[in-house]
Amino acid sequence: MNENPAIGENATDTNTAKPEEEEESWGSFLIFCLKLVLAVLIFRTFIASFFTIPSESMLPGLRTGDYLIAAKWPYGYNENSLPLGLPGPSERIFANLPERGDVVIFKHPVDRTDYVKRAIGLPGDTIAMQDGQLILNGEPVKREEAGYAYIPMSANTACRSDGGTVVDNACRYRQFRETLPSGKSYMTLDFGNMGARPLRDATGNLMVDKGGRPVLIDADNTEPFVVPAGKVFVMGDNRDNSLDSRFPPVSGQGVGVIDQELLVGRAGIVLWSTDGSAEWLLPWTWFTAARWDRIGDTM
C-alpha cells in the first residue's frame, strides 16, 4: 500500500505537464515565425528589397550576377512596391520622382518583370540622341573619353564581337564619363554608331509596318522627345546594348517611357556578385564564383 499518496499524485502531474510544455514551446515557435515573416514583409515593403542583375545593359557599373539592395522609400509606395505580388494601393503614397542619374528599379509596363536602368529624363524634359551623344533640353550632356573598361569574361558574361575586344580573358570596351547638369556623373559604354536595327516582338519575330517592311530604330539618332507628365525616360549605361525608353514597350524588349507608378525603388549597394560558375550542389563553388571586389560597390 502507498503510505504517501502525494508521491503518486506528483508523478501524474509531472506526466501531464510535459505535453502542455511541448504545446507551449510549439506555440511560441509559431509566434516567433509569424513575427519574423511580418518583420521581413515590413522591411521589404517600406525599407529595402533585393534584386539581381540579369543582363549587361548597365555595364560597366553593374554586371550580370550582381545582387543589389534597393531603397523603397525614395519614390513612395504602391502595389508595385510590395513583395511577392501582394495586393496594395494602385495610386502611389508619398510619391516622389527620381533625380536625374538615379539608378532605378521598375516594373516592365507589359510583363511586370523587374528592370534596372538609369533615370535620364523627367516630366517636361526633351530627350534626343545625335550620333550617340545624349541631348538634354537642347544641350549636349557633357561626355568625355575615359579610356577602356575591362570586363572579365565568365560563365554569365560574354564579349560582344561588335563592340568589345578580348584581352587576357577580359572584354575591353571604350568607355565615356557622362556628366549631367546636376553634376551627377557615371561611366557609359559606346560601341560606335550601330545604325538602324530591326525591332522584334516578345516571341523574337521581326516587327513589320503596315506595308510588311521591318520596323527599324536607330538608337544613336532619335528625334527630340518631350517626357510626358508622370513619366520617366530611362536608359542603360551600356548604350548600344540596352532596350530602354528609346524603344517601344514590348514584353522582354524595350520599355518605353516609364510611368511613375511602376517605380519600385532606387538601387543602392551591391550585396553579392557571382560570375555564374557556382553550382548549388557544390557549396565551395559559391565562394570561388564570388566577385569579392564588387561587394559593397555603390551606385
Q: Would you name each region that the model predicts?
A:
Residues 2-27, 42, 47, 51-52, ...:
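Soluble "head" domains of membrane/secretory-pathway proteins
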Residues 32, 36-43:
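Hydrophobic alpha-helical membrane-embedded or membrane-associated segments
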